[in-house]
A protein has these predicted regions:
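Glycine-rich N-terminal segment of FAD-binding domains in flavoprotein oxidoreductases
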Residues: 27-53
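Active-site histidine-anchored catalytic micro-motif
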Residues: 57-67, 75, 125, 139, ...
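Class I SAM-dependent methyltransferase SAM-binding "motif I" and its flanking Rossmann-like core
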Residues: 136, 140-182
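N-terminal glycine-/serine-/threonine-rich phosphate-binding loop
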Residues: 1-33
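A glycine- and small-aliphatic-rich helix-loop capping segment at beta-alpha/alpha-beta transitions
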Residues: 47-58, 81, 144-154, 210-212
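Glycine-rich beta-strand-to-loop/alpha-helix junction loops that act as flexible
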Residues: 35-40, 131-135, 196
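Ligand-binding beta-strand-loop-alpha-helix segment within the catalytic cores
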Residues: 1, 57-130
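ATP/nucleoside-binding phosphotransfer catalytic cores, i.e., glycine-rich phosphate-binding loops
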Residues: 183, 187-233
Length: 233
């Protein structure tokens, strides 16, 4: 099933997304859930944490997966995806270390891709992937190009991505990222795409044509049979 839902504002989008996440967790307490980071899913995660505490949901068997990470930044720096997930998911939920499958960020090479991919496979694959639409149409750090890599890989960051809000605190240029590939994302049993935020109208319009193109990596989600998109633009 492919569902496209227009939502009136960011708050409503985040509320609905958190309910969706909670439903997945309730139906499969040992779910493996891949999480994007950044401004788009921030309020969704806040609401999710709130609901889990209020409703005393058992999360002891859950596993979260970090979708991507900047390369060459120490993991503990403010702008990393790791710091984001630690602050907004891991610490508020009191997760054990083994409940987050996570890319390291320094001295990265392709063996890091193998390590993370193998850990996901051992858990039985992704049940849900939560994604945001990038200003240039990227998914994770799968950047637009003439061709896209299906598997987990180290990517060269698009010029627009190098100006990402999260990197404003980096204090140095960041030109590479490590990310799950499009095949990894499309292999998830369900995909939830959140489309919100300023400067994304062009990417949103191109995505909504439903024409699959390597120039808009997010367009590959139209190939997924169990895909929900919440839009507020």
């Amino acid at each position: 099933v492919q569902t496209l839902q227009q939502v009136e504002n960011y708050t409503a989008l985040s509320e609905r997304a958190s309910e969706y996440l909670l439903a997945v967790i309730r139906s499969k307490p040992d779910a493996v859930i891949c999480l994007a980071t950044g401004a788009t899913p921030l309020l969704t995660y806040h609401y999710l944490v709130e609901k889990i505490h209020q409703q005393q949901v058992d999360i002891s068997q859950l596993t979260f997966v970090k979708l991507d990470e900047w390369v060459d930044l120490p993991l503990t720096m403010p702008g990393t995806c790791e710091t984001f997930l630690q602050q907004h998911i891991v610490q508020p939920l009191g997760l054990r270390e083994d409940q987050l499958i996570s890319f390291r960020s320094e001295e990265i090479n392709e063996t890091e891709c193998e390590r993370v991919t193998n850990l996901i496979a051992r858990k039985g694959g992704l049940d849900l992937c939560v994604l945001g639409l990038g200003k240039n149409g990227h998914l994770g750090l799968n950047e637009p190009g003439e061709s896209l890599q299906p598997a987990c890989h180290i990517s060269q960051l698009d010029a627009r991505t190098q100006q990402h809000e999260m990197l404003k605190t980096a204090g140095r240029p960041v030109t590479r990222g490590i990310t799950l590939g499009l095949k990894d994302i499309l292999n998830a049993r369900e995909v939830l795409l959140l489309v919100t935020g300023e400067g994304k109208q062009d990417a949103t319009d191109r995505f909504l044509t439903a024409k699959v193109s390597t120039a808009i990596p997010a367009s590959f989600l139209w190939l997924h049979s169990n895909f929900i998109c919440l839009i507020n633009t």
